[in-house]
Each structure stands twice: as C-alpha cells, then as structure tokens.
C-alpha cells in the first residue's frame, strides 16, 4: 500500500505551549511493538498513551493536562531500538 508511511515519525505538539489540551501526530511504517508516552523533565512517566503491538499508519493523539502541573514535558515514541522525542510546555 503506497499510503503507508516509510519511516517512524513524531510531530511537535500543537498548540505549544498548551492548556488544557494539545495534539500531535505520529507515523508507524510497519507492525511494531510501540510505546507512546509523556514524561516530565525528570524522566518520570506522566501518561502512557499506548503500549503494545501497533498497526502501521498515521495517527493523531489528543493529550489532556488533567493531573499535570505547569512545566516542560517530553512526548516519547519508542519502537524497538528507535526512540523519538518532542518537548512540550504546559502553562496553567
């Protein structure tokens, strides 16, 4: 299928800074074991968005800032040895 992405990709979130919600997109080129999560700047897990076997394609995610304090966070996409990150800022 020519519509499938050919590489892993994690976009920046929008809007950034955000309050109360933000969204981003990501691409998975093949069936993969994937972990998609938000971490605080100290490396603590804040929200696990997805963990498990993931089908290929392009996907959009909305993140709600419930139970999150103002500050910097990292969106992290892990697939095998690959790790992609994007920084985002919550302003309450």
List the predicted regions and their residue ranges.
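Glycine-centered coil/turn sites that cap beta-strands in beta-rich domains
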Residues: 1-38, 60-65, 79
């Amino acid at each position: 299928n020519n519509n499938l992405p050919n590489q892993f990709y994690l976009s920046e979130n929008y809007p950034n800074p955000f309050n109360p919600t933000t969204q981003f997109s990501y691409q998975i080129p093949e069936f993969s074991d994937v972990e998609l999560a938000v971490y605080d700047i100290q490396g603590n897990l804040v929200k696990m968005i997805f963990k498990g076997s993931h089908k290929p394609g392009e996907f959009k995610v909305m993140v709600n800032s419930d139970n999150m304090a103002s500050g910097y966070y990292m969106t992290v996409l892990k697939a095998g040895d690959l790790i992609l990150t994007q920084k985002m800022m919550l302003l309450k």
